[in-house]
């Protein structure tokens, strides 16, 4: 969006800032329900916990879509970026997280600039949505486990430590919560079952209040959002953990322009034409 370039450069007045990330949203979020879900998840990320970690100077992953780095912070670690290996295998995705941690480990800050905002294409199909989340989860596990093993994580502020650790153990904590709820607390009556679903949906709505302030109508997709969050936190993350060293982009192919579910035909072409004319 207008002003991104000017705004994203502002934090570099501090010589200790090595990387700056921007706020991001889904392009044409209303063109598909899975884009709405993705935009909700992105909004929660960039309205809530990324600014908090950025204020502390340690965003654990400056998203590669619009990451800006200080040149002198990148050049010394370039070889480690281009030749990343995990458990003996060369990594071909997840370079944004890798570079973020290399810069953090070099003593620089990684921050967030909310006034710089970019729109990005996201998948319009459930299949592509799932594959994208699998790739992101694999990248996160490799990146964060490396940060833990090398000791980089322990030198970051508390809020970054606790956020990264929470991301790593989400399948365990959510799995145990649902197991306890179903097998120890669930009263198999209509009221009991309704209460459980109401708790799941209401809880997700409270956690997404920042998105609902901007998009009140998203309350209508709250059940779909709750399903997507459980899907990502449990089966997808569990599968990604077990296959974290399986390399691949999943949503992009050599014989294809653009990612799966991200072609021009998935957009509202009338809106695109109006924006081009404008």
Regions found by a protein language model. Name each.
Residues 126, 130, 154-161, 220, ...:
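Alpha-helical membrane-protein architecture signal
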Residues 248-278:
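Cytosolic juxtamembrane C-terminal amphipathic helix followed by a basic/polar low-complexity tail immediately after
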Residues 155-164, 229, 251-260:
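Charge-rich, acidic-biased intrinsically disordered regions
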Residues 162-248:
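Membrane-embedded multi-pass helical conduit in multi-pass membrane proteins
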Residues 139-155, 237-244:
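C-terminal, non-catalytic tails of nucleotide-sugar-dependent glycosyltransferases
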Residues 19, 155-166, 267-273:
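Loop-to-transmembrane boundary segments
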Residues 149-160, 184-188:
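Short juxtamembrane and helix-loop transition motifs at transmembrane-helix boundaries
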Residues 1-150, 277:
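Non-transmembrane catalytic domains and loops of membrane-associated enzymes and transporters
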């Amino acid at each position: 969006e207008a002003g991104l370039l000017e705004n994203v450069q502002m934090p570099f007045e501090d010589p200790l800032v090595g990387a700056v990330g921007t706020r991001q949203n889904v392009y044409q979020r209303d063109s598909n329900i899975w884009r709405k879900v993705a935009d909700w998840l992105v909004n929660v990320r960039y309205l809530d916990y990324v600014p908090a970690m950025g204020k502390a100077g340690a965003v654990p992953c400056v998203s590669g879509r619009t990451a800006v780095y200080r040149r002198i912070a990148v050049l010394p670690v370039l070889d480690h970026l281009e030749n990343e290996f995990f458990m003996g295998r060369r990594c071909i995705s997840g370079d944004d997280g890798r570079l973020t941690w290399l810069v953090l480990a070099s003593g620089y800050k990684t921050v967030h600039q909310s006034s710089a905002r970019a729109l990005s294409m996201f998948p319009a199909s459930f299949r592509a949505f799932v594959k994208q989340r699998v790739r992101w989860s694999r990248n996160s596990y490799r990146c964060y486990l490396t940060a833990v093993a090398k000791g980089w994580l322990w030198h970051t502020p508390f809020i970054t430590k606790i956020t990264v650790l929470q991301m790593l153990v989400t399948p365990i904590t959510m799995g145990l919560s649902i197991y306890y709820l179903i097998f120890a607390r669930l009263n198999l009556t209509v009221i009991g079952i309704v209460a459980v679903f109401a708790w799941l949906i209401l809880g997700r709505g409270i956690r997404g209040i920042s998105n609902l302030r901007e998009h009140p109508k998203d309350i209508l997709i709250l059940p779909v959002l709750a399903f997507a969050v459980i899907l990502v936190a449990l089966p997808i993350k569990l599968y990604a953990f077990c296959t974290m060293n399986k390399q691949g982009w999943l949503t992009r192919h050599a014989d294809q322009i653009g990612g799966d579910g991200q072609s021009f035909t998935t957009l509202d072409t009338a809106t695109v034409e109006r924006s081009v004319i404008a």
